[in-house]
């Protein structure tokens, strides 16, 4: 019997029993029985089925795996995660995610004004919000408003102009400044289909020289105390973990040097996304497990902090597809 690679991509979320594809949960309903029930209600055309329990499972797996690695290596920093809203902004996905993530302080990542408004509206107060992407004055002002609402928000600047806008808004509004993060443009690139979105030739992030310029600008405007995070992203859906290790070492050294310069409140490294899931039905394309991923992140950052004599940083991830991909099934009529 052809199982269409379900043993490769399903991660036990779906199984084949008695010749039927079934949801591996509670009474194990078959997909075809779900479809028949929906058709009886006179719904036509393709169907998009969502399974919130799978989203909940992925959130728990991500946090439990990283927290287990933290315990194993006696790591002093904490693990934190935010969900990138660009992956899925629909209410029937976001509401279960917010509810399940509350116990972990799971947050949201926004890359546009619309996404930031969603995060400000639905994120659990106290859970982190990170802001990436292009930011004009209006979006940065929204970040200040989010801070005034009590949100734990970090605006991650990708160019010196964004830092200049933060200073401008701060001077105009006299509002409390949000946390500031620096996206660094590493020499290390990623692996897989989206590898070019990271590395030294990427259009995103600050070079080493620009990082120093940004630090001096923050010093001149009394903003160093708001610098809490450095961020990198070496590409989505990495099929190998080796490039991540290089990026962790490079970013770890930048973190340590900034700490030694005087950025005393800098306490976090955001490793971006990149955690892959299997899409292939014929062979495995991801050559690492989540446990290996977490162990390498924890071990590498602990080692660098020890070498440099600085505090072990808190760790942030922005994994999207790992959390969301498996929970949605598209079913189409066969012509």
List where the protein language model places each region.
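Glycine-rich tight-turn/loop motif centered on a GG-T
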Residues: 44, 102-103, 126-129, 148-154, ...
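Non-cysteine beta-strand/loop elements that form the S-adenosyl-L-methionine
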Residues: 108-114, 131-136, 178-194, 228-232, ...
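C-terminal active-site-proximal or functional interface alpha/beta core segments in diverse enzymes
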Residues: 44, 236-335
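Active-site/ligand-binding-proximal alpha/beta "capping" segment
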Residues: 180-185, 190-227, 232, 241-253
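Acidic, His- and aromatic-enriched active-site or binding-groove loops in soluble protein domains
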Residues: 110, 129-133, 178-183, 204-212, ...
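Active-site-proximal loop/turn and secondary-structure-junction residues that shape catalytic pockets
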Residues: 53, 87-89, 114-115, 135-137, ...
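Short acidic, glycine/serine/threonine-rich loops at helix termini
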Residues: 93-96, 120-123, 140-145, 166-170, ...
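A charged N-terminal "starter" segment
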Residues: 1-179, 212, 216, 220-222, ...
